[in-house]
Amino acid sequence: EYAREVKPEAFIQFSTDETSGPCEDGQRFEEWSPILPSNPYAASKASQEAISISYWRTYDLPIIITNTVNNFGEMQQPSKFPVIVQKKIAKNEVVPIHGSEGNIGTRYYIHSRNVADAILFILKNTTPYHHIPNKVDRPDRYNITSDDCLSNLELAQKIAQFMGKELKYELVDHHSTRPGHDKAYSLSGEKLEKLGWKQPVSFDESLKNVVQWQMDNPQWIE
């Protein structure tokens, strides 16, 4: 409603890879793949997408929807997996990894600065679609993703490597600890790549910088 008053040139609706639900091996969802959320969080994000589309159709708000894979970065919430891993490694504690032997969940990761770069690229290089009355159409939409797919164990191993410490871990049943937690999500970034966007900083360099920042600022993960 506030956007209707101020009339922005573009309204970015941030969403998640979770709205499409779990993927099969090798599958990558495109921008308008079916919405099949598995848990209440993903359903709430899908609802936000639906509301933004309704405002685009009803009021011609300049909506652009973005769906993003797992973000990480300096000053990330302490409750997020990469921070939990580093905190436990620093304290020489066991890191719980969701999954079983040979069946550990995976995620695509992207640094938050790369996401910001993608958003600025979209704003500079695209123009929001306008709704045409009585036409079955939809707003513009982009997946912001990477090619950096790691299992939770692989991510923990990289963090331990960059810390120069040993990783102690145990596999735990994710269905009992996190109901509705999907094994894998995956988005295709082909649409944005065709426009010319590329990640400015690699995953390994980004993660190494984040780990070092948290080692230099231990109060953040205590």
Predicted regions and their residues:
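Short glycine-/acidic-enriched loop or helix-start segments at secondary-structure transitions
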Residues: P22-E24, M75, L153-L155
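Structural signature of the Rossmann-like NAD(P)-dependent dehydrogenase/reductase core
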Residues: A10-S15, I64-N70, Y108, N143-I144
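Conserved Rossmann-fold NAD(P)-dependent oxidoreductase catalytic core, especially the SDR/UDP-sugar
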Residues: E1-N39
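C-terminal substrate-binding subdomain of Rossmann-fold SDR/epimerase-dehydratase oxidoreductases
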Residues: I89-E222
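Active-site Tyr-X1-5-Lys
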Residues: E5, P22-D25, L36-I64, I89-A90
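Active-site loop of short-chain dehydrogenase/reductase
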Residues: A3-F11, L61-P62, V94, V136-P139
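Flexible, glycine-rich beta-alpha linker
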Residues: T19-G21, L36-P40, I64-V83
